Amino acid sequence: MSNSPWQKSPHSERDRPGGLSHNCIWILSAIACASAAQAPERLDRGMVAVHAAANKVYVGWRLLANDPPGVAFHVYRSTAAGNPIRLSKNPVTDSTNFVDEAAPLDRANQWWVRPVVNGREREPSPRAALPANPGERQYLALKLQGAYSANKIGLGDLDGDGKLDFVIKQPGSSIDPGQGYWRRSPDTYKIEAYRHDGALLWRKDLGWNIELGVWYSPLVVFDFDGDGAAEIALRTAPVDADYRDADGHVLSGPEYLSILDGRSGIEIDKVDWIARGAVSDWGDSYGNRASRHLIGMAYLDGTRPSVVVHRGTYTTMRVDAYDLVNRRIGKRWSWNSDQETPPVRGQGMHGMKVADVDDDGRDELILGAAALDDNGRLLWKTDLGHPDVVYVADVDPAHPGLEIAYGVEVKRGENGISVAEARTGRILWGVKHPTTHIHDQGMLADLDPAHPGLEFYGAEADGSRFWLHTARGELLATEDLGGNSPHALYWDDGPVKAYIPGPSRFRRPGPRPQLPAGARPAGAAVVSRILKYKGAQIGEITGRIVGLADVLGDWREEVITAVEGELRIYTTTIPATSRRVALMQDRLYRMDVALASMGYFFPPQLGGKLFE
């Protein structure tokens, strides 16, 4: 099944507050609706050219959901601003990439494509360029404004030109509010917006009242007002006052949800964040549980994206939903887990998942081991407890609808690793042995073509045990695939993913390590391998992974890394022999990419099948 609005029609919206009834005609995976409907993000061809090896230049571009069936492409090059040369003898039909083996690399070059429909060439795409003597490298570099690295990044078209731009939060350090981890913030976070070409658009200092840590400073980049350009929604506080106590905690003072204009960084509007109240109301006296903040977006009415604000993870959870209409933020609904009967406690995750789990055209919110319907009412809860690992995807193709893969942090006698039905929360399968603390992000991906569906990997926090299961729960392996959080990605060709092993940093018994004064270190520019499961190395990247998505080029994914002074966007240079619509035009995938700018980093999942 598919969870993309460009691939299926929602049911009629009825019997829901604010619902709209509309009929849509769905043609070639693109929307053609007679009335208001969820509009796909405008994307251009995403041209990319990298000097892959020797005299070879890899060129890639996007296939779009609204391309006519049978569209083909001619590939062109211009050298030193000279006349165009057509490189493709025949239109390219079986892929959206091309290897140019004759480019004069001692001079500057540009590449572009022209779609061919019914034998006639159409308008050219934007161009990808390489300077003279570019050197061999498999990434594009976006230079930052100083010798710092990004902590988190958000992707979105900030100026409406069809190209994805970058919003970064810097510096790269992050302090956890937990006891034994917290330290006084040595610096303030700055939000910086860069165009796709590296030009700095604006910078905003969040000030001392937003402490230096992921959980204090969530942000999300999305087009909330439907004007074709993305905004930034984030937690803010006054910058002209200092609410730190003597130790450096910020446990008092105003807190806001702000929405910033993507082009300028100017605040469009702000409203109060979910109230802190008494810090102890959240489960401790020192601010850990009160300082767990998340933000996201969801198509709660099936038409326009709402901003979703979340406070609390381990005990109480509160959620507010807002709409940006006529440049004003208005509340849609609120939910308080303590007002349920019985109260819903201890079910939160370190992030948020958004998906249309009941196939009604409107999004639900997966908060961890509990879910809210689009109207802000509790849809279901599993009572598994706080999960570290949460993925929503079409895990098992034989089971209708979406599933949720869980790795549970709290100690359990069974089901610590499990897969649930996303519509109802019903456990489909789970391990029958005890687990102590399934930690970090695990991995969910089609790694082994011998088994249908997606394989699910999870590990104990101390590194004592590892499990790889099939989509149906069959145990495949108990080997360490790279710590608690290896990252899977489409890198070569076909439906099977490669993966990047994570660092083997395990929580061992005993006192927690004393971190350097200030914050957790961002990490050195480590070199990581890209591997096939039970296979060879097929790539290599440098830097700390801060993004993974189909950012440009064909349907394979790019890896975005942070090194001091720059972002690197690594792209595959392995020629593909197949073509697929850009993954960013899958609804579930696009929402996952947007949500990766806050909380735990979970690589995005598709709502439908990549290969039929």
Predicted feature locations:
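Beta-propeller-forming repeat regions
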Residues: 10, 40-42, 54-56, 63-68, ...
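Hydrophobic h-region of N-terminal signal peptides that target proteins for export
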Residues: 29-37
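Short, compositionally biased P/S/T/A/G/V-rich stretches that sit at domain boundaries
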Residues: 38-50
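A structural signal for short hydrophobic beta-strand segments in well-ordered beta-sheet cores
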Residues: 20, 49-50, 560
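Short beta-strand elements bearing conserved aromatic residues within extracellular beta-rich modules
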Residues: 73-75
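Short intrinsically disordered, low-complexity coil segments enriched in acidic
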Residues: 2-4, 33, 157, 223
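Short, low-complexity intrinsically disordered segments enriched in A/P/G/S/L with frequent Arg
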Residues: 1-10, 15-23
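Generic short N-terminal amphipathic or hydrophobic helices
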Residues: 22-26, 30
